[in-house]
Amino acid sequence: MATLLRSKLTNVATSVSNKSQAKVSGMFARMGFQAATDEEAVGFAHCDDLDFEHRQGLQMDILKSEGEPCGDEGAEPPVEGDIHYQRGGAPLPPSGSKDQAVGAGGEFGGHDKPKITAWEAGWNVTNAIQGMFVLGLPYAILHGGYLGLFLIIFAAVVCCYTGKILIACLYEENEDGEVVRVRDSYVAIANACCAPRFPTLGGRVVNVAQIIELVMTCILYVVVSGNLMYNSFPGLPVSQKSWSIIATAVLLPCAFLKNLKAVSKFSLLCTLAHFVINILVIAYCLSRARDWAWEKVKFYIDVKKFPISIGIIVFSYTSQIFLPSLEGNMQQPSEFHCMMNWTHIAACVLKGLFALVAYLTWADETKEVITDNLPGSIRAVVNIFLVAKALLSYPLPFFAAVEVLEKSLFQEGSRAFFPACYGGDGRLKSWGLTLRCALVVFTLLMAIYVPHFALLMGLTGSLTGAGLCFLLPSLFHLRLLWRKLLWHQVFFDVAIFVIGGICSVSGFVHSLEGLIEAYRTNAED
């Protein structure tokens, strides 16, 4: 009797569990995620067995074909993606594809390139998140107060986490349970998430976001160059727009760049100069420590302008674009997490101290670019170094934007929208050079008509920065690794996606309002 009762209770519990699991699976399936049930697990195992046999057959065919002098001339070539296997549904690029060499030979290419150490990788990340845009952080504290300081810490934690989960999306387990790298770029991750229905949609979305962010970065360099020169020499009869035109004339040779060998020689010098400038600004602020206005640091926020501060802070931490290539070039990829921890901890401490000390020194008089608050004699010297750094930093995002445009629109073979920019001899065609010059001129026009450093940085950070750093990594992590995630990882990803979405929309709207208001003010003047 007891056995019969126990069996009935077991059957009831099993049926209830199966129903609840079916409901949860159905709900997540409608959302685009797949919850693995026992029957699905058997199906996946069966598919893996069939796939293993299929690839064994392919290997035998390859061995046979290697033993033959030549194949059938009338035979059709294999369809791209049939030989290469990828669990995400998107085929890997063929052995001769240019996608293999994007950025830095990942898992699928560039094995002959020298690998970098964790220290060198950390230096690259530091260059990305400790650049010139730190100069706008005191302006974020002006409108955010102590909450702005908290956001500098919070953004560092979240960006570090999303960088790690983005790299986790590059890896999957093979049949032997080994974790292997099956993707090599942000675009490949996005395509895998949208496969098989829309195998290229995700990559196009990421490419558009990358182009917007890179071009906006170029615009910001032109804006800050004109702003700094105008405030360094206010006595000269030269307007900020004229200084921007002069800066663009200096940058026009960037259109002729084929590689970054010439520019990379100056990267270390630029970074060292930037650290020296930060030290000079902090030293001046410390010399006025007696006059610090602690009472000006607010516990409340400016509701209209604080979302702009969020975009500024987020934009100063953006590095996710090149993390897949960077991790693929490391000698010890296992050290990537440790490298991310220390670089973001250092960035958080330095940014927080710089923003707080600078704001305490000038309080409500803090300007969009903090060096504009310095005395005339010091300001001219510091700003000249900053302009030099901005001009030498411009080619990096410009060249990256050109590469993304060329590979997405001009170098995809039969799928290209336009003919290739390069001739058969590797030389740049005249119309390709014209397009590059047009991109330089476009950055100038944007800098002339929207010469507001902080507002532009807030707009970019809210639009593409939040998308590439918060929204897409968390969404991709849920989509690709749903079956392996623990409940707290799912909670973190969903929370980051929701908070990032709210901050992105709010910051974008308020940044646009700020730009419209500033444009109207300039028109009235």
UniProtKB/Swiss-Prot annotation:
GO terms for cellular component: cell surface; cell tip; cone cell pedicle; dendrite; dendrite terminus; GABA-ergic synapse; inhibitory synapse; neuron projection. Changing residue 213 to A: Loss of GABA and glycine transport activity. Loss of potential gradient-induced Cl(-) uptake. Loss of beta-alanine transport activity. Signal peptide: none annotated. Brain. Expressed at high levels within the neocortex, hippocampus, cerebellum, striatum, septal nuclei and the reticular nucleus of the thalamus. Also expressed in islets where it is more abundant in the peripheral/mantle region. Highly expressed in the nerve endings of GABA neurons in the brain and spinal cord but also in glycinergic nerve endings. Expressed in glycine-, GABA- or GABA- and glycine-containing boutons. The modification 3'-nitrotyrosine is found at residue 186. InterPro entries: AA_transpt_TM. One of its GO terms (molecular function) is active monoatomic ion transmembrane transporter activity. One of its GO terms (biological process) is hippocampus development. Residues 1-132, 226-265, 327-341, 405-438, 483-489 are cytoplasmic. It is a multi-pass membrane protein. It is found in: Cytoplasmic vesicle, Secretory vesicle, Synaptic vesicle membrane; Presynapse. It catalyses: beta-alanine(out) + n H(+)(in) = beta-alanine(in) + n H(+)(out); 4-aminobutanoate(out) + n H(+)(in) = 4-aminobutanoate(in) + n H(+)(out); glycine(out) + n H(+)(in) = glycine(in) + n H(+)(out). Residues 154-204, 287-305, 363-383, 460-461, 511-525 are lumenal, vesicle. The chain crosses the membrane at residues 133-153, 205-225, 266-286, 306-326, 342-362, 384-404, 439-459, 462-482, 490-510. The keyword Hydrolase does not apply. The keyword Transmembrane applies. Keywords: Cell projection, Cytoplasmic vesicle, Membrane, Neurotransmitter transport, Nitration, Synapse, Transmembrane, Transmembrane helix, Transport. Belongs to the amino acid/polyamine transporter 2 family. Antiporter that exchanges vesicular protons for cytosolic 4-aminobutanoate or to a lesser extend glycine, thus allowing their secretion from nerve terminals. The transport is equally dependent on the chemical and electrical components of the proton gradient. May also transport beta-alanine. Acidification of GABAergic synaptic vesicles is a prerequisite for 4-aminobutanoate uptake. This is Vesicular inhibitory amino acid transporter. It comes from Rattus norvegicus (Rat). The gene is Slc32a1.
